[in-house]
Amino acid sequence: CDCLMECDNNGNNAAATPVAHPVLANVTLVGNNSAAGTRGVRLRAGTEVELYNAIITGKAKCLTVETAETENSFSKQQNPSVLEYISMSTELDSQEGIYTNADFEAGAGNATDYVNTLTDGYVGTIQGGKTLSDSFFTAAAYKGAVSASDDWTAGWTL
């Protein structure tokens, strides 16, 4: 796939259990804008996901959802999957048309108009991320992997 991230459950039986259910927060995913490998995050084959405080850019399709089982996991009736405070540079690509770009944009803090305006290739953060009360997470008030006030990548080169 050459994706920035691909999450699958079972390609032969998308309804198979146990269901793959990654939980990720404070993620920055940057593609190289190549014409090949156009997907950023690919959710498919029945996977569920919780993704919070993320930036996705540099791919023609920043976020693709595939298979009815995966797309239905975002429905208000089931809702085991959550996408909140996600900023990306393209609209969501829905293969089945069940979970649409309008549904994504209606989610808390989601946007499809993110523009990397920095010229040095560094993707900065966007303030106002979700506070996660689960002790598994370290609290952060920003989206992405790097705080503007504490750049742990300072000095890195591309």
Q: What residue ranges belong to the model's regions?
A:
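Extracellular beta-rich repeat passengers
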Residues: C1-L158
